Swiss-Prot record:
Pfam families: Ribosomal_L36 (PF00444). This is Large ribosomal subunit protein bL36. InterPro entries: Ribosomal_bL36, Ribosomal_bL36_sp. One of its GO terms (biological process) is translation. GO terms for cellular component: cytoplasm; ribonucleoprotein complex; ribosome. The keyword Ribonucleoprotein applies.
Length: 38
């Protein structure tokens, strides 16, 4: 899980999800693409 100021989609399987007022990127294809804004 990467913690970044600005999260970006890295591939076509990445999805931007908002959970508990935190923007996250989840990816079904590559777990390395997981990100959290903070």
């Amino acid at each position: 899980m990467k913690v970044k100021a600005s999260v970006k989609v890295l591939c076509r399987n990445c999805k931007i999800v908002r959970r508990k007022n935190v923007v996250r990127v989840i990816c079904t294809n590559d777990p390395k693409h997981k990100q959290r804004q903070g």
